[in-house]
Amino acid sequence: MPYLLRVELPDVPGSLGRLASAIGEAGGDIEAIEIVEKRLGGTAVDDVLLETIPGTMPDSIVSACNGLDGVRVVWISRYAAGGNLFLDLEAVEALTDAPDQALDRLVEVLPITFRADWAVRLHRVTGSGAGTENAPGNLEFCDLEAPSRLEFSEDDDNLYAGARISGNEIVVIGRRGGPEFLDSELARLGHLVSLAVSIATV
């Protein structure tokens, strides 16, 4: 069973090695690690994609990680995206492969790129547009000047982030239950949306 683990750890040599050893001893097999954010206080936030051996409970992996000095598990969840981390460069490639479909492709790749559950385009007048499976159909358009975390009053289960496509259209991505979208992820979202817009208008 693939899991995605988001962990905060000291940004010092040897930290990843200790983390990998703890995960392995608890019954997890690491398939990929991606640095999500480096923080000023000397810590880093990493996403770890791992497989568990049969019979291993995710709680045991969380406990093993939290038992390390300076390490804190932010979030763990089953990861349904085919067991592959989809990096930003692959997202860019998907956008440039079909410039006339760049905005639709953007919606398709955002959930995988950001470990989100869904993505949807919202228009000021017509409401929900292109969206992935499980995207809610009742979200309302909101004006955005910069990529931002969003809140919708009717839903407490999802965490949202959005970015402006144009004055009349935005894209929103959502995660059920977490983790929270980090500032570095908002910046990446803004860059990818801007790139998709520029590709679509060439």
Q: Where are the regions that the model predicts?
A:
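A conserved regulatory-domain signal marking ACT and ACT-like small-molecule sensing domains
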Residues: 1-97, 109
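Short strand->helix junction
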Residues: 51, 178-179
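Hydrophobic, well-ordered secondary-structure segments
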Residues: 89, 103-107, 186
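Helix-loop-beta substructure at the N-terminus of cytosolic sensory domains
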Residues: 99-129
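GAF sensory domains
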Residues: 118-176
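Amphipathic alpha-helical "output/dimerization" segments
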Residues: 181-197
